């Protein structure tokens, strides 16, 4: 997969993508990440990329032409079609479902805004989709782009050392539940012990415990997800069991 990122700070994206899963994806040739700076396509001695908004008001707006020329260069660099995605708090929320859709693409272009935003005409004519990583405002789209790169990279075949790791993540699977708790060594600690069932070697019992915990954790923390999960009879039974076993004060 190839991801092109248009940003006034492409080195920021490169640094974020140099480590961990995304860095490994690039090393293995499973992800190609390329940064593009619209300032390099701006005209004049100052290579200006922003100006004051028509109608007045605070802040500056990114200009059409540097962005358009930069996008032209991006599209000329690879003949494969690629959706142009603008990172914006007004966009479609980034979910695991959307991440899986994006991960199937051979290529995409991410556009990072700055200042008060981008000239609306560029968004209307050049952008195919706007994506939001949350209901808050950042200084620019770079952090959002880094999130998209990470979530998409880890879904590429061969990136994770254990393919089951992604399949068991929160929001994965057809019902999109939260993940169950995980434990490692030591088995006994001052802060608590590992549940006996996880040390039993009984794979069926372990699978049942994990499913129950996943259902229960979703009910406690994201009950809205259960409304869309369409739980079957056995899952409803496990959730009822979780509720009965819940200690007073654990509803957090």
Curated annotation (Swiss-Prot):
Which key words are in the record? Cytoplasm, Methyltransferase, S-adenosyl-L-methionine, Transferase, tRNA processing
Subcellular compartments: Cytoplasm
SUPFAM superfamilies per record: alpha/beta knot
Which reaction(s) does its UniProt entry say it catalyses?
Answer: guanosine(37) in tRNA + S-adenosyl-L-methionine = N(1)-methylguanosine(37) in tRNA + S-adenosyl-L-homocysteine + H(+)
Tell me if Nucleotide-binding is a UniProt keyword of this record: no
Fetch the PANTHER family from UniProt. Answer: TRNA (GUANINE-N(1)-)-METHYLTRANSFERASE
Task of the protein: Specifically methylates guanosine-37 in various tRNAs.
- Describe its partners and assembly state: Homodimer.
Its protein name is tRNA (guanine-N(1)-)-methyltransferase
């Amino acid at each position: 997969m190839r991801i092109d990122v248009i940003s006034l700070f492409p080195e920021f994206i490169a640094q974020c993508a140099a480590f961990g899963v995304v860095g490994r994806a690039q090393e293995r040739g499973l992800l190609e990440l390329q940064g593009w700076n619209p300032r390099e396509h701006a005209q004049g001695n100052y290579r200006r990329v922003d100006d004051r908004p028509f109608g007045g008001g605070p802040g500056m707006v990114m200009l059409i032409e540097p962005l358009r020329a930069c996008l032209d260069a991006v599209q000329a660099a690879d003949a494969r079609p690629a959706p142009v995605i603008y990172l914006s708090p007004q966009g479609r929320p980034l979910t695991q479902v959307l991440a899986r859709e994006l991960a199937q693409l051979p290529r995409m272009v991410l556009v990072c805004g700055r200042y008060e935003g981008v000239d609306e005409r560029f968004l209307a004519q050049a952008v195919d989709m706007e994506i939001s990583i949350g209901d808050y405002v950042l200084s620019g789209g770079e952090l959002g782009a880094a999130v998209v790169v990470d979530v998409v990279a880890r879904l590429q075949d061969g990136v994770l050392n254990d393919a089951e790791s992604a399949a068991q993540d929160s929001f994965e699977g057809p019902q999109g539940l939260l993940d169950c708790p995980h434990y490692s060594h030591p088995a006994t600690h001052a802060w608590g012990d590992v549940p006996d069932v996880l040390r039993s070697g009984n794979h069926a019992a372990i699978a049942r415990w994990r499913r129950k915990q996943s259902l229960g954790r979703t009910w406690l923390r994201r009950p809205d997800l259960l409304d869309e999960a369409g739980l079957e009879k056995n899952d409803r039974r496990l959730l009822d069991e979780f509720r009965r076993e819940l200690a007073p004060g654990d509803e957090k």
